[in-house]
């Protein structure tokens, strides 16, 4: 898969779906439910947003990467103090389960030269366009950005400029600043 200079995400990659392991992922990680294998690749050091799904997500990186995570139950009135976000380093080749109650978003690289390449396994249809004519019913619907994707955007993010729900308050964490100290 490509390694862009920014971050790119493909919800479902046909080449990955055709691998024999795709059936095993569906059977063993999702209990036989249809799933999609996609990827998130590139270079990133910032939080920008947090998202959650109503199902677990599985990630597997070809290089070490960092996930910026928080707990969904720490969101109060649609807001989350970014001081509650914690960084977790994931070793290359280690499969991690990001629970439905875990706020997360794009991985961060540990090496700017290598970037990150992360396989993303989710229930089929996740992170795809909302059905035509979807009407928000208020509440959590205000955060619904795509199918099975509730998004909290930092005010400094591109997603906030596109109209995403503003959720994280405080610093838009940049792990490259931590590495410089």
Residue ranges and their predicted role:
Residues 1-92, 105-181:
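Active-site region of the double-stranded beta-helix
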């Amino acid at each position: 898969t490509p390694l862009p200079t920014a971050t790119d995400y493909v919800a479902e990659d046909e080449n990955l779906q055709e691998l024999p392991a795709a059936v095993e992922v569906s059977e063993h990680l999702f209990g036989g439910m249809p799933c999609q294998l996609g990827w998130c690749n590139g270079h990133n050091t910032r939080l920008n947003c947090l998202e959650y799904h109503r199902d677990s997500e599985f990630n597997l990186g070809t290089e070490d990467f960092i996930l910026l995570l928080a707990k969904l139950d720490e969101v109060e009135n649609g807001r989350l103090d970014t001081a509650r976000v914690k960084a977790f380093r994931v070793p290359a080749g280690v499969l991690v389960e990001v629970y439905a109650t875990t706020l997360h978003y794009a991985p961060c690289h540990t090496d700017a030269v290598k970037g990150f390449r992360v396989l993303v396994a989710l229930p089929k249809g996740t992170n795809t366009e909302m059905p035509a004519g979807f009407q928000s019913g208020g509440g959590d619907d205000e955060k619904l950005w795509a199918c099975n994707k509730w998004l909290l955007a930092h005010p400094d993010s591109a997603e906030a400029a596109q109209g995403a729900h503003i959720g994280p308050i405080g610093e838009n964490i940049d792990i490259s600043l931590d590495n410089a100290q």
